[in-house]
Amino acid sequence: MTSQNPNQPISYPIFTVRWLAVHTLGVPTVFFLGAIAAMQFIQR
């Protein structure tokens, strides 16, 4: 209820930067891993 509650920070940019970093690295990684796994099954 108080604006100084540490459990509810108003530092949204921190979470935004973290979200961008996780998805920028995570989405392509999962995509390439899936593509490599698919190629392995296709060749066999």
Swiss-Prot record:
InterPro entries per UniProt: PSII_cyt_b559_bsu, PSII_cyt_b559_CS, PSII_cyt_b559_N
GO molecular function: electron transfer activity; heme binding; iron ion binding
Gene Ontology cellular-component terms listed: photosystem II reaction center; plasma membrane-derived thylakoid membrane
Cofactor needs: heme b
Ribosomal protein among keywords: no
Major location category of this protein: membrane
Membrane protein topology class: Single-pass membrane protein
Taxonomic superkingdom: Bacteria
Residue ranges crossing the lipid bilayer per the database entry: 19-35
Gene Ontology process terms (BP): photosynthetic electron transport chain
Residues that coordinate or bind heme: H23
UniProt cofactor note: With its partner (PsbE) binds heme. PSII binds additional chlorophylls, carotenoids and specific lipids.
Places the protein is found: Cellular thylakoid membrane
Record key words, sorted: Electron transport, Heme, Iron, Membrane, Metal-binding, Photosynthesis, Photosystem II, Thylakoid, Transmembrane, Transmembrane helix, Transport
Alphabetized HAMAP family for the sequence: PSII_PsbF
Function: This b-type cytochrome is tightly associated with the reaction center of photosystem II (PSII). PSII is a light-driven water:plastoquinone oxidoreductase that uses light energy to abstract electrons from H(2)O, generating O(2) and a proton gradient subsequently used for ATP formation. It consists of a core antenna complex that captures photons, and an electron transfer chain that converts photonic excitation into a charge separation.
Assembly: Heterodimer of an alpha subunit and a beta subunit. PSII is composed of 1 copy each of membrane proteins PsbA, PsbB, PsbC, PsbD, PsbE, PsbF, PsbH, PsbI, PsbJ, PsbK, PsbL, PsbM, PsbT, PsbX, PsbY, PsbZ, Psb30/Ycf12, peripheral proteins PsbO, CyanoQ (PsbQ), PsbU, PsbV and a large number of cofactors. It forms dimeric complexes.
Family note: Belongs to the PsbE/PsbF family.
Protein name as catalogued: Cytochrome b559 subunit beta
Species annotation: Trichodesmium erythraeum (strain IMS101)
Underlying gene: psbF
